[in-house]
């Protein structure tokens, strides 16, 4: 492992959680419980072991946020995790989760196998994409589970149970008169193995669920990352964008169902919805759980024309 002192770092911006390219470098920020210690772990791509572990200093902490920046960082060459009090902690604001490509796979003994990737932000031709203008009272909504809907469908010729497979269903939905698709949780969540324990409200814990798989995803999730095991390709960003573009070309809107338990940071909830709207062109959200900050969302300028559905929605 490379010595920490050989990696030049600067004080980061705590306002932006996760890993984000900012002003010539990469900013890493993570929320931790009061009194906890944290560090950043970097991996070279295709390397099983950590490349370097960089402890956060007290100077890089404000409140319960740690933040540091690495100048001239090349994210395409690395992957990362955080460590909190000596335990690997997957960034809840990561744009990509690696190591969970197979749905329902048992947790690996290697604690460094599951790790975070960076937003590629590669050029994508939206072909003048426009969201379908469908009033609430005219919505004919079809709710589905990305994996379950096409996994046993004999008419699907591509990789079943994926975003790509849903593209093949568009003519069928058009025939039915469907104009809105609602996706059950399609962001990353740990359906088996070690996960964050929402019931105990711990930042980092190990809750073993051997032999059990949470098929539906109504648990704390990684709200910025399309679920990797729902992808036919190794590029979740492009695959999900392509699905949205083709839905819109057919005049079909896409609403994402998202579950936020009560311990969710309300600003992370807001930022997650803004991200899916701006980056993926999602048309709306069906929000579940006790952590939905309805007043904040309803008054947000970016989401002002976005379809928002939640408990007591009127």
Question: Model-found features: residue ranges?
Answer:
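Active-site-proximal helices and loops of the catalytic beta/alpha 8
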Residues: 54, 218, 272, 278-314
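Short proline/glycine-enriched turn/loop motifs at strand-loop junctions of beta-rich domains
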Residues: 31-37
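Aromatic- and acidic-residue-enriched carbohydrate-binding clefts of CAZyme catalytic domains
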Residues: 155-162, 193-249, 260-280
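Catalytic domains of carbohydrate-active enzymes, especially glycoside hydrolases
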Residues: 168-186
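Conserved, mostly hydrophobic/aromatic
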Residues: 30, 144, 183, 223, ...
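Hydrophobic faces of well-ordered beta-strands that scaffold small-molecule active sites
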Residues: 140-142, 181-183, 254-256, 285, ...
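The feature marks proteins involved in alpha-glucan
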Residues: 1-23, 53, 60-145, 150-157, ...
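Structural beta-strand segments of beta-rich domains
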Residues: 24-28
